[in-house]
């Protein structure tokens, strides 16, 4: 089941989020602080607005793609999945059929 989010939110394992930055402008989705291996979070740009109102995915102390930086989604219609692998690698990004600006990874 997918849930619409229009403001800051802390995700939980299994979330499927329709992020609408057109309603209230750019905001942040924070990943869980104590994920288990295999936990997944899915995020879609429900309003095709990430290019003008970015969505930040805050790492909450864990890495994303092995990096110690938050992820900023800046391409409209972007959809990603994140799977937690380990403390070493952190969250791995699964990209859907839409483009993702990988310069932000």
For each feature predicted by the language model, list its residue ranges.
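Exposed extracellular interaction/assembly regions and N-terminal maturation sites
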Residues: 1-58, 89, 94-96
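Short, low-complexity N-terminal tether/leader segments at secretion or assembly junctions of large
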Residues: 51, 58-62, 75-105
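Surface-exposed loop/edge segments in extracytoplasmic proteins
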Residues: 64-66
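Beta-strand-rich interaction surfaces with strong enrichment in secreted/lumenal proteins
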Residues: 68-73
């Amino acid at each position: 089941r997918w849930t619409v989010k229009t403001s800051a939110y802390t995700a939980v394992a299994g979330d499927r989020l329709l992020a609408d930055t057109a309603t209230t402008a750019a905001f942040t989705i924070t990943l869980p602080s104590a994920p288990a291996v295999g936990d997944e979070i899915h995020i879609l740009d429900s309003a095709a607005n990430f290019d003008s109102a970015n969505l930040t995915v805050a790492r909450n102390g864990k890495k994303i793609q092995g990096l110690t930086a938050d992820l900023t989604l800046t391409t409209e219609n972007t959809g990603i999945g994140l799977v937690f692998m380990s403390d070493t690698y952190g969250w791995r990004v699964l990209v859907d059929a839409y483009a993702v600006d990988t310069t932000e990874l």
